[in-house]
Regions:
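N-terminal glycine/serine-rich phosphate-binding loop of ATP-dependent small-molecule kinases
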Residues: 1-91, 118, 209, 221-228, ...
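Short, acidic/turn-prone active-site loops that include or flank metal/cofactor-
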Residues: 30, 35, 94-101, 177, ...
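Residues that line or immediately flank small-molecule/substrate-binding pockets and catalytic motifs
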Residues: 32, 74, 97, 211, ...
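Active-site core segments that coordinate phosphate-bearing ligands/cofactors
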Residues: 4-6, 102, 109-171, 181-183, ...
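Short beta-strand-loop/turn "lid" adjacent to the catalytic site in phosphate-handling enzymes
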Residues: 62-96, 123-129, 158, 162-183, ...
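A conserved helix-loop-beta module that forms one wall/lid of the active-site cleft
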Residues: 191, 197-212
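Short, conserved phosphate/pyrophosphate- and ester-handling motifs at nucleotide-, phospho-/glycolipid
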Residues: 45, 98, 232
Length: 484
């Protein structure tokens, strides 16, 4: 038996096959263009995203016989508006990183803000989907016309892909929990929240489970069931082998995303982390998690490269000592504001402590350290099991300097996975569950334990200096009014 997992991510779309022997192999990877039409705005061509999924699906169906089911991982908060009659997008996809709606959210009445937090567990932030959906209805004439005509699809990107592939208008509970429109306890669209954001409830797709016989994809003369669909970070959580309370993972991708399983009901976290649905299998109750992220991690590395301070990630692999922080140089990776636990879109990215003898190497090192220190801040706000190391993956985790500094800043071991494609692996494993089978563990699913070095106490003692740098980035942002 084989499961085809498609991971539609922020920078590319990847397809993998996982068989019942535990072998995970790549079908293909297609990159897509990212658009920045104005400051704070981030968009994708939704047609390009869908075409890439379809191309990889067709390739897999040609090359891989006996595909028993298909699993789809999505970007989470990214949204699309489309014509349900011809399945064509009416506007570019608005990406989770987009900040255009923050000013609208800042103007919400206090009672509305309280209602959003109480019902969804989420802060009123442009990161989440609801304000993006509202913006499309208010600002794109074709979208408003389609709503009046009764043929509008308006939802997170997974719904667009599923509608296009199956003609079913649906999303799953993990993705719906990222919109700010779903009651987190009842796991249904909330009418009051829809009124707050100006998004008619009857425009939204139905909410279903993350696994099970969800829909049927008819393509290339074959009918194959869609057996799993969920947010990419929740798929990665499953791929890490996290199953019980206290199990946690951190993914160092475009942003840093840390999740920890909390149990069968959502909990309120007083440290700025947000409750979310981890997954829900068909016929079962939901499992919940706490989630926190940093908007710009690998994105900050890419930005540093674009400035000419490095040619690739390999240039960031520097000798372990002395750290930039020990030399008085800090970098705050708030290029799109600060997410958990601060939730401050006015914060700005900055290097602090530049001198005449500061080199590009020092600045590169400070970037890695800033990402690691922000990530450690996230982990320490999660209810992580004390007897298990945090499990890590993502492109930045492959950099020895970075992952060692992260372990030192955290002061505890980090379990670094050998398998880099944890999102695809988790989605595929979810696919096996959707077919009523036990997850097929990947044959290369080992790990290396990264233990804190002797420098850890010294680095941890400097955490307060970094916290002050973060506070300075927030104060400077408020002074200059940088938030959209």
């Amino acid at each position: 038996m084989k499961i085809l997992a498609i991971d539609q991510g922020t920078t590319s779309t990847k397809a993998f096959i996982l068989d019942d022997e535990g072998e995970l192999r790549l079908v293909g990877r297609l990159h897509h263009e990212r658009f920045h039409p104005a400051p704070g705005r981030v968009e994708h061509d939704a047609e390009e995203l869908a075409s890439n999924i379809e191309s990889l699906l067709d390739q897999a169906l040609r090359d891989e016989p006996e595909i028993a089911g298909i699993a789809l991982a999505n970007q989470g908060e990214t949204v699309v508006a489309w014509d349900r009659r011809n399945k064509k997008p009416l506007y570019r996809a608005i990406v989770w990183q987009d900040q255009r709606t923050q000013s609208m959210l800042d103007e919400l009445r206090p009672d509305a803000r309280d209602s959003i937090r109480a019902r969804t567990g989420l802060p009123p932030d442009a990161y989440f989907s609801a304000s993006k959906l509202s913006w499309l209805l208010r600002n794109v004439p074709q979208v408003a016309e389609a709503a009046r005509g009764g043929y509008l699809g308006l939802a997170t990107s997974d719904s667009f892909f599923i509608d296009r592939l199956t003609n079913e208008y649906m999303t799953d509970v993990t993705t719906a929990s990222r919109t700010s429109l779903m009651d987190l306890h009842a796991r249904v669209w909330d009418r009051e929240l829809c009124l707050i954001f100006g998004v008619p409830l009857d425009l939204l797709p139905r909410i279903g489970a993350s696994t099970g016989p969800l829909a049927v994809i008819s393509r290339s003369g074959k009918c194959i069931p869609l057996v799993a669909t969920l947010v990419d970070q929740q798929a990665a959580l499953f791929g890490h082998g996290c199953r019980v309370c206290g199990d946690a993972k951190v993914t160092f991708g475009t942003g840093t995303f840390a999740l920890a399983i909390t149990g069968q009901s959502p909990i309120v976290n007083q440290k700025g982390m947000v409750p979310t649905v981890a997954w829900q299998h068909s016929g079962e109750g939901a499992l919940y998690a706490l989630d926190g992220g940093d908007y710009t991690s690998a994105a900050a590395v890419d930005w540093t490269i674009s400035l000419g301070l490095a040619r690739s990630l390999a240039d960031f692999d520097l000798p372990p000592e002395p750290s930039a922080l020990e030399q008085g140089l800090a970098f705050v990776p708030a290029l799109a504001g600060l997410a958990a636990p601060h939730w401050d879109r006015t914060a700005t990215g900055m290097w602090i402590g530049l001198r005449q003898d500061t080199t590009a190497a020092h600045m590169r090192r400070a970037v890695l350290e800033g990402i690691a220190l922000r990530s450690a801040e996230l982990i320490e706000a999660l209810p992580v099991s004390g007897d298990k190391p945090i499990s890590a993956d993502g492109g930045l985790a492959s950099n020895p300097s970075f992952i060692q500094f992260f372990a030192d800043a955290l002061g505890s071991p980090v379990q670094l996975k050998f398998t880099h494609e944890l999102t695809s692996l988790g989605a595929a494993e979810m696919g096996f569950v959707g077919l009523g089978r036990s997850p097929s563990r990947c044959t290369s699913d080992g790990y290396r334990l990264i233990c804190p070095s002797p420098a850890s106490p010294r680095i941890r003692s400097l955490r307060s200096s970094f916290s002050k740098a973060v506070q300075m980035s927030r104060e400077f942002g408020r002074l200059t009014g940088t938030a959209d």
